Amino acid sequence: MTRLAVPKTYKLYIGGKFPRSESGRVYEIVDSQGGFLANAAKASRKDARDAVVAARAATGAWAGATGYNRGQVLYRIAELLEGRRSQFVEELRESEGLSEPVAQRQVDAAIDVWVWYAGWADKYVQVAGNGNPVSGPYFNISTPEATGVVAIIAPQESSLLGLVSVIAPALVSGNTVVVVASERAPLAAISLSEVLATSDVPGGVINVLTGSAAEIAPWLASHADVNALDLAGAGPELGRPSDCRRRDAQARASARERRACTIRRADHVLHGDEDGVAHEGHHLKSGVGREPRTGACCQRTGHLGWCNGTSGDGRRSICASGARRR
């Protein structure tokens, strides 16, 4: 009796789980010769929102972990990827039509990227941070911090090495990621998700969506809870890079306007100001410290900050979106 093979189902990876698309949609993945390989889930707007929610929920713990701990997690990914090297080589050969030596070099390079950034996890702060010379009786120190949720459009041609090369730099500093994998060849990305699920990466730190980048990218760009965009894999279907930046700027402006209105309403409740502007002497509980009053210098406190520059009537306004002014 002939045994039937068990076909693999390629799903999304959201919050450490493998759900099907909320819409129930799938699309066909073909090999370099046009032959059928598999069906992959086609992410919807709801899936993109769920991925952002999962990434935001994981931000605190991942950003709060020590650099040494994050380095250990990234190195563990490299270990597991090394153990499944032959599987990834075969998937790259089938989906991208690469020769055996080229596929092997790409998988080896992807493993090396994880090892490289694992080593940087507890060192980049010393390189990027510094003490700044100031004319005053205090210290001024710059230190890098996590941005938050980063939405990434992965390169379309290099489905594994390109994907790893955009994910690892975002993770090393404590960001969480929502990545749209290569639409044409997403098999390696979903197999990488299986590696992540069995590694020490907390659920929600990396979320992988498959489907149309042109369809998903605008939803991510306009999401108020996405802090940064990486358009490494943006192609003609998304328009020119300048068009992408313009749409992103419009979405950010709308989000800032909504956030500023929320801040004014909250300040009105806290301090009783009719115009929603904080007066001298009022300090929000979310503040993390004070800076010397030396003109326009904004202390980042999450989404709120104090602008120490005063207006003509002696009032100080609230900065939204954690702006930094020097």
PLM regions with names:
Residues 168-171, 219, 244:
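Hydrophobic/aromatic ligand-binding patch that stacks against planar heteroaromatic rings
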Residues 2, 112-127, 141, 230-326:
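C-terminal segments
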Residues 1-136, 290-295, 304-309, 313-316, ...:
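N-terminal Rossmann-like NAD(P)+-binding subdomain of aldehyde/semialdehyde dehydrogenases
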Residues 205-206:
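Nucleotide-activated donor-binding/catalytic signature segment of Leloir-type glycosyltransferases, i.e.
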Residues 153, 173-176, 180-182, 209-211, ...:
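Generic beta-strand/beta-sheet core signal
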